[in-house]
Amino acid sequence: MIIRSPEPEVKILVDRDPVKTSFEEWARPGHFSRTIAKGPETTTWIWNLHADAHDFDSHTSDLEEISRKVFSAHFGQLSIIFLWLSGMYFHGARFSNYEAWLSDPTHIGPSAQVVWPIVGQEILNGDVGGGFRGIQITSGFFQIWRASGITSELQLYCTAIGALVFAGLMLFAGWFHYHKAAPKLAWFQDVESMLNHHLAGLLGLGSLSWAGHQVHVSLPINQFLDAGVDPKEIPLPHEFILNRDLLAQLYPSFAEGATPFFTLNWSKYAEFLTFRGGLDPVTGGLWLTDIAHHHLAIAILFLIAGHMYRTNWGIGHGLKDILEAHKGPFTGQGHKGLYEILTTSWHAQLSLNLAMLGSLTIVVAHHMYSMPPYPYLAIDYGTQLSLFTHHMWIGGFLIVGAAAHAAIFMVRDYDPTTRYNDLLDRVLRHRDAIISHLNWACIFLGFHSFGLYIHNDTMSALGRPQDMFSDTAIQLQPIFAQWVQNTHALAPGATAPGATTSTSLTWGGGDLIAVGGKVALLPIPLGTADFLVHHIHAFTIHVTVLILLKGVLFARSSRLIPDKANLGFRFPCDGPGRGGTCQVSAWDHVFLGLFWMYNAISVVIFHFSWKMQSDVWGSISDQGVVTHITGGNFAQSSITINGWLRDFLWAQASQVIQSYGSSLSAYGLFFLGAHFVWAFSLMFLFSGRGYWQELIESIVWAHNKLKVAPATQPRALSIVQGRAVGVTHYLLGGIATTWAFFLARIIAVG
């Protein structure tokens, strides 16, 4: 650690009134670009307007100005998020059965949307129990509201109004920090101060406030709710906060206040800061006292982490020093120069953040079902399936975004003259080895994983079940996964002596937990069927990575096109007269990567949906007999391609296909409509620009004949635009089809 002399106290970090607020400017489409601001000559203008409106790099090359625009746009984004949240809470307050659900969450479904009768749409208002008719929601809001101690619709109203106020504040902040007091570039590049605020402030104090809220408000209210007290009889949140005796009745150690904390007698707090593990048998969720303890611990960690870096006081680590000291045996100059890259290229910074956040989102998807955090979440199968699917898709998109911005960084921000023999340079120098090895891995995984299925389909067709790979014939048990499960199941009392239960029931060993006659969670068995589909996961993930990584590593140059960097991030082909150079731009790799990402995530959510219905979700009789939704058919049916088509896609589509005339009929229409949107994409993906230009010209001729030709000349979409429209409809159509299929099925049978 280097101790430097303290820097001068006051730095002026903002410019006052740098950009005047002008409504005339806002009213002029394309004011950010000289060409676009001239107005439309051809229909391509509207596409360029949309493509470049938020591409701040194309407006100016001044990094400070770009940074200010991005910063201001973030406030706009936060404003939209607050507005959306406000809408969710408002629906809970105005149109929902939240109070009824709170009184009986096992028999009443959550609903926060009631359809108005105009021409018969009121059929969509299904009976969700307790005499309430509405659309069943699967977002998990009811469960999170209960966990946070909300007991009335009035509280939801107040929160909704609060969120609206915050949305307004964010809009104001976005305007203020661009037009009135805009930060200087030095402020955006002061990473140590940023770490201090983000780690200690956002994550540290944020977690601490949440832990405080949980201890003082959520825990006592949930204890009353679990005991069956009527929500209207429970004291209001502020009474718990202001009146310590009220809490001391539930948790006697509260009477001692902060004394145990300062006398280091912390075990006194073990009543409400627990380390139980497992699930609460009443609600089927994690113990809320465990969650409070967790957030307190996280807060301490991040408060410490936020104070490790050198800010105005001359003590602590400098990030540049840390990075430059980081040299491995094979990495040459190591991370030298990385500090400069990450403080001058926001694309590089964003790429890292997207990769991390995308991975984290996928981790969240897997924990939401294996360690369900909110009360009664585990028995709401529709919500469980929705949350898993949602977080998987979001994670997939964020990871593709990481590759996109890494490639933009390579094209726009990377300076090969100043980067010599550092980590990135070394990776680029042996990119051929990386890509060819990855390609080999993809071929190996593809042939072997698919080959196992094809073998099974063939043996099945020939009537030779004894020659199939299955749990009852030739076993391919996932022994490593089973070993991991077993290690975790046996951890309490062994490798984790402090824990009473393993982290998740899914590991095995423990009993099942049932709430209101429905299975919340039980040990999940893994067998040959899972071994097969996991290798399909490995295959699709590796192909996605191959496409995206090739796009990044060859973004600036390749043997085929040595001067690729000059052509930019997106271009259709390397100019006229050079055949075989189409689909080589970095943008095209993102385009192709999106399809494989869609492929990969689809297999994951199909696997999850079927596995849970077959081996986990179901009802339990008074005698303790579990009946699963699809009766455990996953292990024998999913080992052939035909089984996936017949027993998953076809068998489980019956609910969405037969939904007409029921409250689920909207899903039937979405299922049809989204198939149409998906098919529509193929028109853009399978036809060339020339075909459409030719067609347009004869249509324009007809308009001229009738003297109704427009002043703006119609043009066919460019090649890149056509691909963009195509992939968008492909993904949206595919995702909405899956959504309708999943929800109609799980709401009908779950």
Curated annotation (Swiss-Prot):
Residues at which chlorophyll a' binds: H675
Purpose of the protein: PsaA and PsaB bind P700, the primary electron donor of photosystem I (PSI), as well as the electron acceptors A0, A1 and FX. PSI is a plastocyanin-ferredoxin oxidoreductase, converting photonic excitation into a charge separation, which transfers an electron from the donor P700 chlorophyll pair to the spectroscopically characterized acceptors A0, A1, FX, FA and FB in turn. Oxidized P700 is reduced on the lumenal side of the thylakoid membrane by plastocyanin.
Main localization (coarse): plastid
GO BP annotations listed: photosynthesis
EC number: 1.97.1.12
Binding-site residues, chlorophyll a: M683, Y691
Record bears the keyword Repeat: no
Compartments (UniProt record): Plastid, Chloroplast thylakoid membrane
Catalytic activity: reduced [plastocyanin] + hnu + oxidized [2Fe-2S]-[ferredoxin] = oxidized [plastocyanin] + reduced [2Fe-2S]-[ferredoxin]
Protein name: Photosystem I P700 chlorophyll a apoprotein A1
Molecular function GO labels: 4 iron, 4 sulfur cluster binding; chlorophyll binding; electron transfer activity; magnesium ion binding; oxidoreductase activity
